[in-house]
Amino acid sequence: MSRVCQVTGKRPVSGNNRSHAMNATKRRFLPNLHSHRFWVEGEKRFVTLRVSAKGMRVIDKKGIETVLAEIRARGEKY
């Protein structure tokens, strides 16, 4: 399973670790992902999404029904 938020599309980005001597070594910054079950009142069932912390805030703001409609419009499965 890829490390991508199903709501926001956040994915790993690359950058550098920096030592005290400012030597650079490559590293990845991973999104804060969680598998979370959301109750969808319209469908009377739970839906499990892999979402970032920001994705959960977006769901709180817009509502799960709206977010699922956006995911469906992109052609993603959930």
Swiss-Prot record:
GO MF terms, alphabetically ordered: structural constituent of ribosome
Ranges where the record places region Disordered: 1-21
Disulfide partners: none
SUPFAM superfamilies linked: L28p-like
Annotated GO CC locations: ribonucleoprotein complex; ribosome
Superkingdom of source: Bacteria
Keywords of the record: Ribonucleoprotein, Ribosomal protein
GO biological process, one term: translation
Protein family according to the UniProt entry: Belongs to the bacterial ribosomal protein bL28 family.
Protein's UniProt name: Large ribosomal subunit protein bL28
Species name: Yersinia enterocolitica serotype O:8 / biotype 1B (strain NCTC 13174 / 8081)
